[in-house]
Amino acid sequence: MFGRTLFPARVIALGSGLFRTPLRTLAAGPALSIGGIYPPIATPFTDKEEVDYGKLHENLQNYSSFPFRGFVVQGSNGEYAYLTREERLEVVRRVRQAVPKEKLIMAGSGCESTQATIEMTVEMAQSGADAVLVVTPSYYRGKMTSSALVHHYTKVADHSPVPVVLYSVPANTGLDLPVDAVVTLSQHPNIIGLKDSGGDITRIGLIIHKTKHLGFQVLSGSAGFLLAGYSVGAVGGVCALANVLGAQVCELERLCLNGRWQEAKELQYRLIEPNTAVTRKFGIPGLKQAMEWFGFNGGKCRSPLLPLTEQEIKELRHIFTVNGWLSL
C-alpha cells in the first residue's frame, strides 16, 4: 500500500541533526527513536493575552535539569487551537533555538483539512521540528471513518519532510483513531508512532501487539497510565503533569525501564490524582495554576478559557497536598 513515498532513496536531514530515510523495513525498526518523556509545554501569555516568549524561555531553562527526551510543542496543552498560524510557528522556532539539539522537538501540526495540515507540517519542519504530532481532524467527525483518516494521514505523511506521529485524543476531539486505521498507517514508512491519550490500556496493548514487528512506537498520552503503558510495551509518554512534576514523571519512567515495578507502582499511585486534576478535572487553567506553585510560568490562558475560581484553586492545591507534593 505504501510502496512509493515522496522521498524514495533519499536521506532527510532533521532539525536535531538526526537523519532518516523513509524506506523502513520490517527488520530495521524505527529510524528515529522517540522513546522517553515529553512535557507538552504550555504557552505563557501576557496580561494582554499575547504570547510571552520571555516566560516560555524561562520555562525551558528550568526544564533543562530534567532528563526529558524532548518537548511536544503546540499540542493540546499549548492551546494551539487559540493561536494564529504564525504564532504556532514562532513558538516552535523559539523552542528549537532555546533547547539543545539532542532534545527532540515534536510539533503539533494538525489542522482540520488535509491540505492545511500538509502546509503546517512542512512549515513546522522548516521551523525546527524533528517530528510532527498530527491530531485527528474532528469537526466533521461523523464522516471521519477509518478510510477517511487513512487517506488523510497518508497524504500528510507522503508530503512531510519529517516523521509523523499520529495523535488520538478523544476527550478533546470526540474521536478515537480506530485500531484498524492505526495498524494500516503503521505500515507507512514515514509514520513512526502514535500518541494515545484515551487511556484504554487494552486498546494500547492491542495496537502495540499488531505493530511492534514494524518498529512502530506508542507513547502513553498521560502520566495517569504511564506505568500501565510501559507494562504493555509503550516506549514513553507525553505527559501534561511533566510540566509540573517533571522529575517525578521521569523517575517513574526510570523505575519502569529498570523493572522496579513495586516502587513504580507506589509512585504511580501518587501521580494519578494530580494528573487527573491538571487534565480532565481542571484542564489547562489547572495545569497553569499548578505550574506557578512549582516555580514555572503558567500564567493566564487565552480567552475564552477562564482562570480557576478560588474554590477550584483550593481544591487543586488540596489534591497536590494529600499526595505529598505540596505542604499546607
From Swiss-Prot:
<feature type="binding site">
    <location>
        <position position="221"/>
    </location>
    <ligand>
        <name>substrate</name>
    </ligand>
</feature>
<dbReference type="InterPro" id="IPR020625">
    <property type="entry name" value="Schiff_base-form_aldolases_AS"/>
</dbReference>
<dbReference type="GO" id="GO:0008700">
    <property type="term" value="F:(R,S)-4-hydroxy-2-oxoglutarate aldolase activity"/>
</dbReference>
<dbReference type="InterPro" id="IPR002220">
    <property type="entry name" value="DapA-like"/>
</dbReference>
<comment type="function">
    <text>Catalyzes the final step in the metabolic pathway of hydroxyproline.</text>
</comment>
<feature type="binding site">
    <location>
        <begin position="76"/>
        <end position="77"/>
    </location>
    <ligand>
        <name>substrate</name>
    </ligand>
</feature>
<keyword id="KW-0809">Transit peptide</keyword>
<feature type="active site" description="Schiff-base intermediate with substrate">
    <location>
        <position position="195"/>
    </location>
</feature>
<keyword id="KW-0704">Schiff base</keyword>
<dbReference type="GO" id="GO:0044281">
    <property type="term" value="P:small molecule metabolic process"/>
</dbReference>
<comment type="similarity">
    <text>Belongs to the DapA family.</text>
</comment>
<dbReference type="GO" id="GO:0005739">
    <property type="term" value="C:mitochondrion"/>
</dbReference>
<comment type="subunit">
    <text>Homotetramer.</text>
</comment>
<dbReference type="GO" id="GO:0106009">
    <property type="term" value="F:(4S)-4-hydroxy-2-oxoglutarate aldolase activity"/>
</dbReference>
<feature type="site" description="Involved in proton transfer during cleavage">
    <location>
        <position position="167"/>
    </location>
</feature>
<protein>
    <recommendedName>
        <fullName>4-hydroxy-2-oxoglutarate aldolase, mitochondrial</fullName>
        <ecNumber>4.1.3.16</ecNumber>
    </recommendedName>
</protein>
<keyword id="KW-0456">Lyase</keyword>
<keyword id="KW-0496">Mitochondrion</keyword>
<dbReference type="Pfam" id="PF00701">
    <property type="entry name" value="DHDPS"/>
</dbReference>
<feature type="binding site">
    <location>
        <position position="197"/>
    </location>
    <ligand>
        <name>substrate</name>
    </ligand>
</feature>
<feature type="transit peptide" description="Mitochondrion">
    <location>
        <begin position="1"/>
        <end position="26"/>
    </location>
</feature>
<dbReference type="InterPro" id="IPR013785">
    <property type="entry name" value="Aldolase_TIM"/>
</dbReference>
